[in-house]
Amino acid sequence: MARVPVVATIRDAYVFTAANLGGIIGLIWIPMVLVTVMGFFTFQRYYNAVIEAMASGATATLGPTMLMMLGYIVAALLLHAVMYVAVVQLALGTRSAPPWAHFAFGAEEWRMFRAFLAFLGLLLAFVIPILVIGTAATGGGGTPGPAMAGLVLLIYGVLILAVPRFLALLPALAVAENVPVLRRSWQLSAGNFWRLLGILAGIFVPALFVMGLLQVVLGGRLPAATSGTDQMQMMAGLLRARDTLPIVSGLGFFISPVLIGLFSHASVSAWRALKTEPTVDIQA
């Protein structure tokens, strides 16, 4: 059974991203601008609508806002598919970086989008029933008890299991092979769960730590914990999220080329290490 070299994969991902950062920016900045602008206005409206609904008790008015959020998620997945296909091709050596801009949507982008959508659907298929059970266990409100805490841990367990097995190889598979991506990812990643988890941690944890640190520095000190009911604490959290939204959006825009470059190359490296058999052309 093939094994993914953890340290070498992480190292090569950082070397690739540092050496090709300008090209990565050229490949993704157009869809990244669209994602950032749409995300800012979508979340701004979402926070305002939820805050108003909690203050007035009229949660039924959140329908249009939730539909808008759903539309944003679909659009963001489409645009991320455009970005990842281009950068994965750069990591594979099948494309050169353009001088200043790129935007395309073809068969590979469509396959990447479907793979992202399928992964999201897979997560929701496990998470939604857990949330429904948790809500019923707490009577739809009140203070969460040990049962709810256990369900939250179960959700984290599902996420930790799914990401290395299904997501780690997804970008490379969607571009390099014409196969059902999630099924192929599950097959190839067998026996490499901890290695893939270590690679993902080595890529995302440092970047997200830096992003969180910059958010604290630029956004000022976090307010003291709010005493009172769960609703008051949630309201305070929403107000804080709304106030820091410009900073979060800006930081996300600037750090995205690094994260996409790191993840794309790590996915390609892991796929190359695990691909010990010829590509099978299976129509999804």
Residue ranges and their predicted role:
Residues G63-S96, G142-N178, R240-P278:
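Selective recognition of hydrophobic, aromatic-rich stretches within alpha-helical transmembrane segments
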Residues A58-A60, Q187, T226-V248:
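Short, membrane-exposed interhelical loops at transmembrane-helix boundaries
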Residues V37-A81:
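Alpha-helical transmembrane segments in multi-pass membrane proteins
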Residues I24, S96-G121, R184:
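Interfacial transmembrane-helix boundary/kink motif in multi-pass membrane proteins
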Residues L120-G139, F204-L222:
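Alpha-helical transmembrane segments and their membrane-interface junctions
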Residues M1-R3, S96, W100-A101, R183, ...:
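Low-complexity, intrinsically disordered extramembrane tails and loops of integral membrane proteins
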